[in-house]
A protein has these predicted regions:
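Conserved substrate/cofactor phosphate-moiety recognition/catalytic segment
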Residues: 19-70
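ATP-binding Walker
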Residues: 13
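P-loop (Walker A) phosphate-binding loop of NTP-binding proteins
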Residues: 10
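Walker A/P-loop
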Residues: 16
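Hydrophobic anchor at the beta1->P-loop junction of P-loop NTPases
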Residues: 7
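Glycine-rich phosphate-binding loop used to anchor ATP phosphates in small-molecule kinases
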Residues: 55-117
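Small-molecule kinase domains that catalyze NTP-dependent phosphoryl transfer to phosphate-bearing small molecules
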Residues: 137-192, 203-212
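Switch/connector loops and helix/strand junctions flanking conserved nucleotide-binding motifs
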Residues: 84-87, 128-136, 188
């Protein structure tokens, strides 16, 4: 069954690391972010990079992403379930209390579901202090941008991410599982994901047979 696996959570919770490792263990899987659609569409249409967000709509990107999922056996996508608009790196002048918005719309989920693609949303749970500590360490090692300016900032982000993840599950179009990335290694998390995916697929097959 074609599958989209979303792996989300707060900054530095381990999303990309788990996505990369899962891709190694799931046959015929690819890593692809919806956001990449902006640039792939731009390349196809010869749109300059500085005009990407003016000339390409979110609906176009959604449709592109659905097409990627429909043409792939398994798509693994590390995501932020919630973001503060116009903020992607640390800025000490930013208002950390500004509203978060969902990155995964109901319309996108419906479009994917209509293609009979199974959607699994994983939430990586990690304490705000640990996430903030990891982000600072990551910046010190490779100068990679970080977005949180304090543990309070990381706490607000964590709560927003989990709220939007729960809202996605409430649509009834998505199955999901919450995993602890603070106390489990990437290898252990990978094993837990694979076990969940196998169990979920078995339940889906039983449900289909029951409905026939």
């Amino acid at each position: 069954m074609k599958t989209l696996i979303l792996i989300g959570g707060a900054t530095a919770c381990g999303k990309s690391t788990l996505a990369k490792n899962l891709c190694r263990y799931i046959p015929n899987s690819i890593k692809y972010r919806r956001y990449q659609g902006f640039f792939d569409i731009a390349l196809q249409k010869n749109i300059p990079k500085n005009e990407v967000f003016q000339k390409i709509s979110s609906v176009e990107v959604d449709d592109w992403f659905v097409n990627v999922c429909n043409n792939s056996e398994v798509v693994i996508s590390d995501v932020h379930y919630a973001v503060q608009m116009n903020r992607n790196e640390m800025n000490t002048n930013v208002n950390i209390y500004q509203n978060y918005v969902s990155t995964i719309s109901d319309d996108l989920l419906k479009k994917i579901s209509l293609k009979n693609i199974r959607i699994i949303a994983i939430f990586l749970s990690c304490s705000p202090l640990q996430c903030f500590t990891r982000a600072i360490s990551r910046y010190s090692e490779n100068q990679k941008n970080i977005r949180n300016i304090s543990v309070e900032d990381a706490t607000i982000e964590n709560l927003a991410e989990e709220k939007e993840w729960n809202d996605i599950l409430d649509t009834g179009l998505v199955d999901g599982v919450k995993l602890d990335s603070e106390y489990f290694s990437v290898g252990q998390l990978t094993d837990q994901c694979l076990k969940y995916l196998n169990n979920n697929e078995t339940r889906k097959l039983i449900r289909i047979k029951t409905d026939e």
